[in-house]
Amino acid sequence: ATPLQNALVAAAVANGGKVMRPTLVDCVRSSDLSVISQTKPRVMSRAFSSDTAGKLTQMMEAVVTKENQNLAIDGVRVAAKTGTAQIGDGNTSIDGWVIGFAPADDPKIAVAVVVHNVDLYGSFAAGPIMKAMMQEALAE
């Protein structure tokens, strides 16, 4: 799966099971910065029930609170899932993955990060990048 596909997975959990159509442009502005057009969120499909999304959110929060405290952000409930994938070319390097969203109780951002060809697990290779992205997005 691509990073975009995995970001859509994280976003689907955050959105109660709804898979949203990804967009690249939030809005188009004129030279005076007034909004000319605004992208509207669109649901592509429902992947699973909101009940299942709630259970997945609890499990993903536990990944942060119990297993990977380095992904935690003070004052923010973070939901994440780390992953490590072998590259398969005969060497010992791996891809380190993490997907997640925050705040878990009122999601504003969903993220997927992959760091290719590293010697670290997902929480250590990709985790700090996800955390920094979330902190920056939530600070705005």
Residue positions per predicted region:
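Helix N-cap and loop-to-helix transition residues
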Residues: 2, 49-50
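A structural-propensity feature for long, helix-poor, extended segments
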Residues: 42-44, 50-51
